[in-house]
Amino acid sequence: MAKKIIGYIKLQIPAGKANPSPPVGPALGQRGLNIMEFCKAFNAATQSMEPGLPIPVVITAFADKSFTFVMKTPPASILLKKAAGLQKGSSNPLTNKVGKLTRAQLEEIAKTKEPDLTAADLDAAVRTIAGSARSMGLDVEGVV
């Protein structure tokens, strides 16, 4: 018989830097999960990733105090800022453009994000990422 699910916990944790302090500790402690076990498993799973890159994770908590977790791809805004070499997006994206991205850069980001996007193909994924880039005040070359 399948385990009874008591809840889902969604967090964004820097790769390789999960520790019992907030927000991880309180979120897992409320459900009675082993915090250190999660931290060790998450840090081991993100060891190959760039340290400090925020990774969204969905933790499934079961009634027997066990858990599983699924890691998602980093947020598109983080990947776009990294590709453009920016600290933050534009405060007024319509008038104040802060950077420029090429189609090749957008394709690379779209390939990274593809498992989490609902796009039918790579071109649709690129257009989705281009929309995010425009809303951050980035100029996009080669995408309609």
Swiss-Prot record:
Entry keyword Lyase: no
Entry PTM: One or more lysine residues are methylated.
One GO BP: translation
Domain of life: Bacteria
GO CC terms, sorted: cytosolic large ribosomal subunit
GO MF, one example: large ribosomal subunit rRNA binding
UniProt entry keywords in alphabetical sequence: Methylation, Ribonucleoprotein, Ribosomal protein, RNA-binding, rRNA-binding
Database matches in NCBIfam families: L11_bact
Subunit comment: Part of the ribosomal stalk of the 50S ribosomal subunit. Interacts with L10 and the large rRNA to form the base of the stalk. L10 forms an elongated spine to which L12 dimers bind in a sequential fashion forming a multimeric L10(L12)X complex.
Family indicated by similarity: Belongs to the universal ribosomal protein uL11 family.
Function: Forms part of the ribosomal stalk which helps the ribosome interact with GTP-bound translation factors.
Protein name: Large ribosomal subunit protein uL11
